Amino acid sequence: MASLKFTKMEGIGNDYVYIDSTRNDIRLTPEQIQKISDRNFGIGSDGVIFIRNSKQGDFMMDMYNSDGSSSEMCGNGIRCVAKYIYDHGLTSSKNPKIETGAGILEVDLKIGSGNKVDLVSVDMGKPVLVPSQIPVVWKNEETIIDQPLEIGDKNLKFTAVSMGNPHCVIFVDDSDEFPVRGIGPLIERHSIFPKRVNVEFVTIRGKDHLYQRTWERGAGETLACGTGACAVMVAGNLTGRSGKDVQIDLRGGTLRIQWQESGNILMTGPAREIFSGEIEI
């Protein structure tokens, strides 16, 4: 068995195992990723993120869910990648460009005490609303905003958004009382979502103040989802429920999401290193 060095980090409770692959090209099988992510027999995480060198950006974020499947992007994950590369001396830039499966994203690091990163703002790019590009199998290419979705005995309405990965946003009266763990997996694997989908269940808490629970594709319910929060703000604005500068509370913490005049979405939130170690794989 080989020994693998890792760092565990979290962004408002969305926790991943980070592996620095800038010096050695480390690759793991889906089974190894499942083992590492297991909260009883492994380190325990929502997945594994490799930090790699990039020919297109300054660094590359290579992300995998806890079930071993690959994913294009994670908003909380990219903030942790940005913190790692700065705090561990891999870059001195406060605006590094990070390559992801959703494209190259630029981050803005807010430095706190001890010359460590406290907050990270990420330009998440423009939301995608064209059904075939999300993707959603739909009757036409018009945007899907508050459209009916029947799941079991629930008659829901959903808005479909891609932030580099697919999201289905559903507004409900009380997210905490809603059966997320029962309904979430049914929507995730619904036939209209050919690549499966992340599902957000959202409650309005006040003007430009929303509360979100997330069922993540390949990971189940998580404490937070950054790309999901971006999709929630977009859906809230498009349905007239919120403005373009919104506080979104998640079970793990709070994010600020802004829809800028350029059309791009800006996400700002914390990132924290929990511990480092080695594991036999």
Swiss-Prot record:
It catalyses: (2S,6S)-2,6-diaminopimelate = meso-2,6-diaminopimelate. PROSITE patterns: DAP_EPIMERASE (PS01326). GO terms for cellular component: cytosol. Pathway: Amino-acid biosynthesis; L-lysine biosynthesis via DAP pathway; DL-2,6-diaminopimelate from LL-2,6-diaminopimelate: step 1/1. Its EC number is 5.1.1.7. It is found in: Cytoplasm. It comes from the Bacteria. The active site is at 74 (proton donor), 225 (proton acceptor). Substrate binds at residues 14, 65, 75-76, 165, 198, 216-217, 226-227. Keywords: Amino-acid biosynthesis, Cytoplasm, Isomerase, Lysine biosynthesis. Its main location: cytoplasm. It is an enzyme of class 5 (isomerase). GO terms for molecular function: diaminopimelate epimerase activity. Catalyzes the stereoinversion of LL-2,6-diaminopimelate (L,L-DAP) to meso-diaminopimelate (meso-DAP), a precursor of L-lysine and an essential component of the bacterial peptidoglycan. This is Diaminopimelate epimerase. It comes from Leptospira interrogans serogroup Icterohaemorrhagiae serovar copenhageni (strain Fiocruz L1-130). The lineage of its organism: Bacteria, Pseudomonadati, Spirochaetota, Spirochaetia, Leptospirales.
